[in-house]
Amino acid sequence: MPFRSLLTAAVIATLPLTISSCSTSQAASNQATTTNAGITLTAAQKAKVGRKIWQNESGGKVDGLTHWNHGEDFASLGIGHALWFPAGADEKFIETFPMLMAYMRDRGVKYPAWMGPENDCPWPNRAAFMRDFRSPKMNELRQFLERTVPYQTDFIILRQQAAKAKILRAAPAAERDTINARWNALTATPEGMFALIDYSNFKGEGTNPAERYQGQGWGILQVLQEMKGTPQGRAAASEFADAAVRVLARRVRLAPPARKESRWTAGWNNRVQRYKQAL
């Protein structure tokens, strides 16, 4: 599919490319530090982030690496549930599995031809996917995803880091240096890196003007603005969690009454408070 190949190449080109990549066996022993525009995580720390993402998305189970949600028209694959569309799918979401495969291909990872970034998802719908769940083809896909967790983690981190420029552009000019410093403090620890990744999946980047109640957003940008000071180390993730609680409380307060968003407050708070836990 030429358009998919062009789109995938264009998106991959926007990612920072100086993060270290390694084979699965190297990942266990490589203690070199990744240094990329604020990312200073060792291979061991990145492994913790990857395990937490996998745990968060699918309980850390191998079966959870191949998933298809009820009511959706695409597969969700890998530790971060990258989306793979079958032929003819017309989705508002970004198809990320071909991007992931292109990323791994460019780093010398070998994979079965049918998984290549130019290909559509071979299962046309959820029913076909579930019928094939224990098939040799699906098992091959799961085994590949299980052994490439380090690459998936790098890809997710890079996509998150690529959002930084967008968030800074959306921030008031007078606040950019402070927001940049807070971002860098977060990405220097596995807890902070996970907090940014999870909150982005949870409530977005905060850069979309349409995602506002009474002019106030609730994404990463707003949480970074709400943080107090510029704490370092694990204190950065802890303050990010507290700031997120305040931002989400403001969202509930400003939401249209008919939405009754207060019913979600406890669950939201429980989720962000976990950012304080050591990985």
Model regions and ranges:
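Bacterial N-terminal signal peptides that target proteins for export
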Residues: 1-9
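Short, solvent-exposed coil/turn linker segments
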Residues: 2-3, 18, 129
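Bacterial N-terminal signal peptides
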Residues: 9-18
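Boundary at the C-terminal end of the N-terminal hydrophobic targeting segment
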Residues: 25-29
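Cell-wall polysaccharide-cleaving catalytic domain and substrate-binding groove, primarily
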Residues: 32-279
